[in-house]
Structures are given as structure tokens and as C-alpha cells.
């Protein structure tokens, strides 16, 4: 079970601890908060149908004191441009400077596939030597033909073996994801 620790709007207010962290990032509305709730088996993270609701860095801990971080989504958000720029700077600062960060979990909506922004992020993470896990979310929304099309597109990008297909709603592959994340904390 995950427990909410705190929200942070800048590096001075980050959660101060000596453990490693796993962060969750992706475009707005891909299901980051829903996934955290699914991992927790409780509604520990606020969920919204409106893109861009998560605007702070949210820190959570599990019973073993492992730290999970929910980052705001990139892409669409309903906020003034200067506030959006400040939020993106906050995310960049966390990703580039956070010493506790061990693994980045990049979520993308399986209905949309991996978009250019996602590919840019994957390339940045690889160049920065960041450990990255890719999750295709909302897999329950796809029929068999759409799943096949997604897998073909992932194969074309050479990513078919490194993407886990998940559904927070149906809990598809959530237990496999928990095992994968547990191994990252070791």
C-alpha cells in the first residue's frame, strides 16, 4: 500500500530522504495517477478526466519505505503559459538533478501509441543513462486488432520487448509491474 508523503513545487520542497526513487511520467491524461492508485490498491492519488490536473511533484512511500514519485504530465494542460513553463522547468530540474532517482517509468496511452514527444523523452533518458521502463496504459480500451497494430508499431520502433501493457481499471499486468518495480528498488 502506498501512502501520500507530500507535494512539491520546487527543489527546496522535495521530499528529503536517503532511499532511491521511481518516478512516473508521461503525457497529460495517460493514467499516471490511476496507475499509482492501482499499485496502491487504494485511492491515494487524485484522478481527473481533465488533462493537466497533476501540477506538483507528488511523493508516495510504500510499507517498505520505497519512494514513488508522480510527476505532472507533459503536453496539454489548462493553465497560463507562464505557469506551464514553470511546471516544465520543475520537471526538468527533478529529472536532471534528483540524486535519489533510480528509474523512470514512462507511460503512454495505448490508444495513441508512442508519440514524438515520448520518443524524444526515451532518447533523452537513454543519452542521460537513465533507467527507463515503458508502460502502454489503458490496454483494456483496445480490441484485438488495435492491440496487434500497437504491437506492430512497437516492433517497428524496436521497443516490443521493453513495453509492458497495463490496465489500471482491469488490473492487467499490475502484479507483474509490482514485481518489476520491487526489483528496481533492490
UniProtKB/Swiss-Prot annotation:
Mg(2+) binds at residues 33, 54. One of its GO terms (cellular component) is cytosol. This is Probable GTP-binding protein EngB. One of its GO terms (molecular function) is metal ion binding. Its cofactor is Mg(2+). GO terms for biological process: division septum assembly. Residues 18-186 form the EngB-type G domain. Keywords: Cell cycle, Cell division, GTP-binding, Magnesium, Metal-binding, Nucleotide-binding, Septation. CDD domains: YihA_EngB (cd01876). Pfam families: MMR_HSR1. Necessary for normal cell division and for the maintenance of normal septation. PANTHER family: ENGB-TYPE G DOMAIN-CONTAINING PROTEIN, MSS1/TRME-RELATED GTP-BINDING PROTEIN. InterPro entries: G_ENGB_dom, GTP-bd, GTP-bd_ribosome_bio_YsxC, P-loop_NTPase, Small_GTP-bd. GTP binds at residues 26-33, 52-56, 70-73, 137-140, 166-168. It comes from the Bacteria. It comes from Mycoplasmopsis pulmonis (strain UAB CTIP) (Mycoplasma pulmonis). Belongs to the TRAFAC class TrmE-Era-EngA-EngB-Septin-like GTPase superfamily. EngB GTPase family.
Amino acid at each position: 500500500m502506498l501512502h501520500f508523503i507530500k507535494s512539491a513545487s520546487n527543489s527546496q520542497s522535495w521530499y528529503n530522504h536517503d532511499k532511491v526513487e521511481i518516478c512516473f511520467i508521461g503525457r497529460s491524461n495517460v493514467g499516471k495517477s490511476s496507475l499509482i492508485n492501482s499499485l496502491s490498491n487504494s485511492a491515494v492519488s487524485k484522478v481527473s478526466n481533465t488533462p493537466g490536473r497533476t501540477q506538483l511533484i507528488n511523493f508516495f512511500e510504500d510499507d517498505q519505505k520505497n519512494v514513488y514519485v508522480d510527476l505532472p504530465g507533459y503536453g496539454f494542460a489548462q493553465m497560463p503559459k507562464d505557469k506551464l513553463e514553470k511546471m516544465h522547468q520543475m520537471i526538468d530540474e527533478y529529472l536532471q538533478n534528483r540524486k535519489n532517482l533510480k528509474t523512470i517509468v514512462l507511460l503512454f496511452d495505448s490508444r495513441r501509441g508512442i508519440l514524438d514527444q515520448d520518443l524524444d523523452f526515451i532518447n533523452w533518458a537513454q543519452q542521460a543513462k537513465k533507467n527507463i521502463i515503458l508502460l502502454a496504459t489503458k490496454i483494456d480500451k483496445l480490441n484485438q486488432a488495435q492491440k496487434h497494430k500497437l504491437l506492430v508499431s512497437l516492433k517497428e520502433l524496436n521497443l516490443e520487448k521493453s513495453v509492458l501493457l497495463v490496465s489500471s481499471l482491469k488490473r492487467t499486468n499490475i502484479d507483474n509491474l509490482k514485481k518489476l518495480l520491487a526489483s528496481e528498488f533492490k
